[in-house]
């Protein structure tokens, strides 16, 4: 009898289910380390459960956020430095949640690639777990999509989904008024926005990713991959202390576009650009690209990753609390009648 012809398998089509299962087993310990009150189930089910009552909520309102990391991924892929890109993913979601006054509760990720490379994927998701643990947020599920023909070799994409909660009536912004003080919390670099511009500037400079960074630190690639700061525990401590009226996460759109998102109609903000020093990375970007200051201010965080809008009579106490939490805090301006953001002084 002729030998039976072997049929086509899913693996022959480029999808390795065994590799996907191996990834889940490898990341389970990291996910378990993110467990918090309210966590009911682990990875592997059709859905993940979370118990709001066990998390201590009486009359909760849920808040959801989703985001990605943009073209910062391209630098991580090209350099092979993927260990912290997951922290960026978490930060972009949970920092947004706290701006609504919510405590992050749980997180899910979506990881898509053309060919699953187990070590690469595990390093990325372990970074996600690290970000979750640092922000008190349980990593309770996710999706790994192996899609042959959709991505070049080694390429991948990430998306994150975070859910938080607050007691009814505790949402932010609330009570913002003229005279409120703006406290700026320092960023540690570009964070996760503006990287299409960053990559264009690097191209113009002629520098390779492994070249020494022209603005200090390690190689250029590693310096630009510094993970987005997590402001969750510090910001929530300030909110619970009383007097905080709003929080603004300074992401795409910079100071110019993000601060007005938390100001009610009829109110604007005045910011003193001389209150803090522009970090070297932004000065290098601006000088290399001959970038005008207004463009810089509506593209990057310019050294301020989160703004806390606080009642004037609580500003000193909240600043002291944030400093005790390890923050570098700068009084950068105030809320004024009007609209939009106006600037005094110069950054460049």
Curated annotation (Swiss-Prot):
PANTHER family per record: TRIFUNCTIONAL PURINE BIOSYNTHETIC PROTEIN ADENOSINE-3, TRIFUNCTIONAL PURINE BIOSYNTHETIC PROTEIN ADENOSINE-3-RELATED
The protein's annotated pathway: Purine metabolism; IMP biosynthesis via de novo pathway; 5-amino-1-(5-phospho-D-ribosyl)imidazole from N(2)-formyl-N(1)-(5-phospho-D-ribosyl)glycinamide: step 2/2
Name of the protein described by the UniProt record: Phosphoribosylformylglycinamidine cyclo-ligase
Domain of life: Bacteria
Biological-process GO terms, alphabetical: 'de novo' IMP biosynthetic process; adenine biosynthetic process
Cellular component aspect of the GO annotation: cytosol
Catalytic activity: 2-formamido-N(1)-(5-O-phospho-beta-D-ribosyl)acetamidine + ATP = 5-amino-1-(5-phospho-beta-D-ribosyl)imidazole + ADP + phosphate + H(+)
Enzyme Commission number: 6.3.3.1
HAMAP family in UniProt: AIRS
UniProt enzyme class: ligase
MF annotations from Gene Ontology: ATP binding; phosphoribosylamine-glycine ligase activity; phosphoribosylformylglycinamidine cyclo-ligase activity
Location relative to the cell: Cytoplasm
Family: Belongs to the AIR synthase family.
Keywords carried by this UniProt record: ATP-binding, Cytoplasm, Ligase, Nucleotide-binding, Purine biosynthesis
């Amino acid at each position: 009898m002729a030998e039976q012809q072997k049929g086509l398998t899913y693996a022959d089509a480029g999808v390795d289910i065994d590799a996907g299962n191996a990834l889940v087993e490898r990341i389970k310990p990291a996910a378990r380390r993110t467990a918090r009150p309210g966590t009911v189930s682990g990875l592997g089910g059709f859905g993940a459960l979370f118990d709001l009552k066990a998390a201590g909520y009486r009359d909760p309102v849920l808040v959801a956020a989703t985001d990605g990391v943009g073209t910062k991924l391209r630098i991580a892929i090209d350099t092979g430095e993927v260990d912290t890109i997951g922290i960026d993913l978490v930060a972009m979601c949970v920092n947004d949640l706290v701006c609504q006054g919510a405590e992050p509760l749980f997180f899910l990720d979506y990881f898509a690639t053309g060919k699953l490379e187990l070590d690469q994927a595990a390093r990325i998701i372990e970074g996600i777990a690290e970000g979750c643990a640092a922000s008190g947020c349980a990593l309770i599920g996710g999706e790994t999509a192996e899609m042959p023909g959709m991505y070049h070799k080694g390429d991948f994409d990430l998306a994150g989904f975070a859910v938080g909660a607050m007691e009814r009536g505790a949402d932010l912004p609330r009570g913002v008024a003229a005279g409120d003080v703006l406290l700026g919390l320092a960023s540690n670099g570009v964070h996760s926005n503006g990287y299409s511009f960053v990559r264009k500037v690097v191209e113009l400079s002629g520098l390779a990713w492994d070249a020494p960074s022209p603005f200090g630190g390690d190689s250029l690639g590693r310096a630009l991959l510094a993970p987005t700061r997590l402001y969750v525990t510090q910001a929530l401590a300030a909110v619970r202390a009383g007097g905080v009226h709003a929080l603004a996460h300074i992401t795409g759109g910079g100071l110019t576009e993000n601060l007005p998102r938390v100001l009610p109609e009829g109110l604007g903000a005045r910011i003193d650009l001389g209150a803090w020093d522009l970090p070297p990375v932004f000065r290098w970007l601006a000088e290399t690209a001959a970038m005008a200051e207004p463009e810089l201010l509506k593209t990057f965080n310019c050294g301020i990753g989160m703004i806390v809008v606080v009642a004037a009579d609580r500003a000193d106490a909240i600043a002291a609390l944030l400093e005790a939490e390890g923050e570098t805090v700068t009084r950068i301006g105030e809320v004024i009648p009007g609209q939009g953001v106006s600037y005094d002084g110069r950054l460049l």
